[in-house]
């Protein structure tokens, strides 16, 4: 596992995301509805739905809202056939970028995604151009815990890897299908999970300086502002020193 903090890069963007909470909720609900529609409403038998529920909870969505979205999906939703599409490309500084979309119209989606890359000095690549650099994983964050006890609980719950960060927080990596089970095991052991989500972990990182980092963040902002875009993954590394200058 690459020795970097995925959560640190997420935190750099939390303030901006909080300002777009309404749009984030819309995208979370769309994923909940689609996951339930495709795989049923039982979170125990539907890993995609369980992952969607965990992510919604991490973003402070209420259980009532989550349950209503699941019920919509089980009932067939609104009749729209949503499909997951992954677009790959290169961002500023040679960073690898993967864009996960949920859409009923591929032409509309690509017309949103391609200009974002172009305007930020990047370019949209072909399928497989950067995907080989990423692995789909579950990521769980626990803040300030007894390292030995948490490690034991995480391993017993089925975690693949555990990384302690400089600030004392612990990042726990799992097979994406096991995210819910591992999260449950950690919580049963008495630890508070701050965040749990399915993500794409890069095998190599690209260090970004104070000139390049804002360009990548602008690209991410533009992509996430697209209605069809659910998640944006990249291998840009933004140090605390560079982040402080942004």
Curated annotation (Swiss-Prot):
GO terms for cellular component: cytosol. Keywords: Cytoplasm, DNA-binding, Transcription, Transcription regulation. Disulfide bonds: none annotated. Gene3D superfamilies: 1.10.10.200, 3.30.70.980. Pfam families: TACO1_YebC_N, Transcrip_reg. One of its GO terms (molecular function) is DNA binding. It is found in: Cytoplasm. Coiled coil: none annotated. GO terms for biological process: regulation of DNA-templated transcription. InterPro entries: Integrase-like_N, TACO1_YebC-like_2nd/3rd_dom, TACO1_YebC_N, Transcrip_reg_TACO1-like, Transcrip_reg_TACO1-like_dom3, YebC-like. Belongs to the TACO1 family. This is Probable transcriptional regulatory protein HSM_1763.
